[in-house]
A protein has these predicted regions:
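Rossmann-like AdoMet
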Residues: 1-56
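S-adenosylmethionine/decaboxylated-SAM
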Residues: 32-252
Length: 252
């Protein structure tokens, strides 16, 4: 599917968001945060996540996910690298169901509290049960053996399993934040995406002109990997930056 075909699926709201990329990033963030509070679906999901310590991120990210899902066809494929406790994976499924879209979704994650140099260790919980419980809370279909690949995305056997799933329309990268790991993930997505696919990078805005007080801009390893392997690659264009999330689209 080419870029022209994908653009025809954009809602008017998505077109407006696309125009944000050249505007003040702090204003973009605030505008989307205001919009978040006017969407009860997003508000309910994010509130549950925050109250139960089920994820990181920020409120405006939910709005971007809504618009990305709105832009997808009736059937599409989604991959998340670094699921943690299931916030984004469940949100994508929730929004897909609300739009009567058939989303074939997968998450790659070690199902443990293993960290990286930025996060030495995460909570000591049963990650499989935590993710299953989150999906159950929102009445979302989920099968651990089908929807989760247990392991690290840098492991060769895990990479092979991902490649066997085919081509993805949307990929979210929030796995290991170490430079070599991020590079490995970026090289992988170049193989498993197509023209028009969205790639969302977390912790990615270290070098962006964001002046919001208290803003978390990301991690230097992630940002350096993006600079070296996405920004310097004419296969991608940046769609929008919201806080420490950056959205790219594959164009060739």
């Amino acid at each position: 599917m080419g870029i022209t075909s994908l653009d025809k699926r954009h809602t008017a709201r998505m077109e407006t968001i696309l125009k944000y990329k050249n505007e003040n990033l702090d204003e973009v963030y605030q505008s989307l945060q205001n919009e978040f509070y006017n969407d009860s679906i997003l508000l309910n999901h994010r509130t549950y996540i925050e109250e139960n310590n089920l994820g990181y991120g920020e409120k405006p990210f939910h709005v971007i996910w809504r618009e990305i899902i709105n832009s997808q066809p009736k059937k599409f494929k989604f991959l998340e690298i670094g699921v943690y406790k299931g916030q984004v994976l469940s949100l994508v499924k929730l929004l897909s169901d609300l739009k009567n879209k058939e989303c074939e979704f997968y998450g790659v994650t070690p199902l443990s509290n293993v960290g990286d140099k930025y996060s030495k260790k995460y909570d000591s919980v049963d990650y499989a049960l935590t993710i299953e419980s989150l999906f159950k809370k929102f009445n979302l279909e989920f099968d651990l053996n089908t929807n989760i690949i247990n392991g690290s995305s840098v492991e060769e056997d895990v990479k092979n399993k991902i490649k066997q799933l085919g081509i993805f329309d949307v990929v979210y990268i929030d796995g290991c934040h170490d430079y070599d790991c991020v590079v490995s993930d970026i090289l992988l997505i170049k193989e498993i995406t197509k023209n028009g696919s969205y790639i969302i990078m977390d912790d990615a805005s270290c070098y962006k002109p964001i002046n919001r007080i208290g803003a978390h801009l990301g991690h230097s390893d992630v940002c350096d990997a993006i600079k070296d392997y996405i920004e310097n690659d004419n296969c991608f264009e940046e769609v929008i930056c919201v806080g420490h999330n950056r959205v790219f689209r594959k164009i060739k």
